[in-house]
């Protein structure tokens, strides 16, 4: 169809060149935590968005939320014990360049979200999301890494 038209029924397409929205999601790697049945997140999730369309796109990263835990240390010897905290660092790199760095201590969560422009013809974009333990004790949580890519367009929407 090379002109405007009105479709007065259902349009079904199993293949569309120039998809409007694509999404991927993956959990972060985890290993056994410092105590019992706890887990500690640690590792990298890498997402590559290929520059394979002739229109501008936006990369949308919904909030990735991460936190450590507070725990009681009974103490021993010269260590009086008390409440201790696990902590985590979180970094995001775009094509190898650090674009965000966060950290959290204890149960107070840290988060990262973004909207990144991807102009057509600008080359592929590789995003690396890295979570790492800070300190000796490991126990914490992180949500899955989700990335949404959409055609950049402002028709039919307004923001003020």
What are these regions (language model features)?
Residues 25-160:
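Extracellular jelly-roll beta-sandwich "head" domains, especially the C-terminal globular C1q domain
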Residues 1-27:
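Low-complexity, small-hydrophobic/phenylalanine-enriched stretches
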